[in-house]
Amino acid sequence: LAEATGRADRFVGLHFFFHPAKNRLIEVIPAESSSQETVDKVVQYCKMLGKVVIVCSDRPGFVVNRFFVPWLNEACLLLQEGVASAAQIDAAACKAFRIGLGPFGLMNLTGPPIALHSTDYLAEQLATPRYDGAQNLRDLIEANAHWDISGDQDYTTEQYDVISERLFGVVFGVAAQIVEEGV
């Protein structure tokens, strides 16, 4: 894309997150040809928009989706294994990560097919099993359904420990991989 513009030194990719009017996070992805001046101006512009900026390399999933997608998938695996219900996993994830929306609520909001497409894309591009989409996510999409998160959100201490350890584990594992790759 940068070369097609005829001004490759002034080209930078931006990755906004859902919902861009509310989510303050943005990834800035310089091309190999991007000048430092261009990157600096784009970062400054994004900060003027009130965004929290992550500058990263042009790699599959950039930074955030590299750990966010397996985080969603790990939640699906926890459900598939019968560790807890979707509502309980969401509640435990919200507490552990101090966030307002759990993995199943988020997938319902953005659409489960987006989560599956992301897992399949990253699994193919990175050839890493942690990105292979969970079967229950595939089944949900086949049924053209959404996750049922209407149930009881109360979880046991044991459930919370398993959920939080598994979700943090996948995030930390991928974060280490990202650092190692220099993304």
Stretches with model-predicted labels:
Residues L1-V183:
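N-terminal glycine-rich phosphate-binding loop for ADP-containing cofactors
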